[in-house]
């Protein structure tokens, strides 16, 4: 195995940022033994993490659709549940295909809620905590949190906008999100980010 795969790990800057903010991800007293370091590579039981790009994706998804872009890297693994078939779903061929592409790349709040509900119902183990990774406007994130809360059953809902980061940690905020996503029990992304 390549050393970059077998010896790779997050820097102390990332771990320190996570440790300082673990209460944003899920309530500190639950499922995370006191003193257990985030460097331990265990799954965060009960955590659902969603990645919902906004901002630049307003136009970027339209470009991706016009190029008939496939899912990125790990998102294209055959074992993952959501598939994108470039041959039969080319968004350049019809408005229906274009809309289907955009549903994945830039879903509405209602589509996000429906996907979360479905994933939660199909999960073998209960999902009680949700962490939202996004570059969306604060007001949009707060509205999404309210909509998720209205589903009921969440012990905790947090987002990367709730993180309290030091000056240097702000430059690696996306890596903190990636650590959380990597360790979540379930991760929902959009396939192209």
Predicted regions and their residues:
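Core catalytic architecture of nucleotide-activated donor-dependent transferases building glycoconjugates
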Residues: 1-164
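Conserved blade-ending motifs and adjacent loop-strand segments that build the rim/top face
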Residues: 162-172
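A donor-sugar binding/catalytic signature common to diverse glycosyltransferases
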Residues: 174-193
């Amino acid at each position: 195995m390549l050393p970059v795969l077998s010896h790779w790990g997050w820097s102390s800057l990332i771990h320190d940022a996570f440790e300082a903010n673990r209460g944003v991800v899920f309530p500190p007293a639950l499922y995370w033994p006191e003193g257990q370091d985030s460097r331990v590579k265990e799954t965060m039981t009960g955590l659902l993490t969603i990645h919902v790009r906004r901002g630049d994706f307003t136009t970027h998804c339209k470009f991706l659709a016009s190029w008939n872009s496939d899912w990125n890297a790990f998102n294209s693994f055959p074992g993952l549940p959501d598939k994108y078939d470039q041959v039969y779903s080319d968004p350049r061929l019809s408005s229906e295909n274009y809309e289907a592409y955009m549903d994945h790349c830039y879903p509405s709040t209602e589509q996000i809620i429906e996907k979360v509900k479905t994933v939660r119902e199909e999960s073998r183990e209960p999902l009680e905590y949700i962490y939202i990774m996004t570059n969306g406007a604060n007001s949009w994130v707060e509205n999404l949190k309210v909509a998720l809360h209205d589903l009921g059953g969440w012990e905790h809902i947090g987002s990367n906008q709730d993180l309290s980061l030091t000056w240097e940690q702000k430059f690696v905020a996306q890596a903190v999100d990636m650590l959380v996503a990597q360790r979540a029990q379930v991760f929902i992304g959009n396939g192209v980010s």
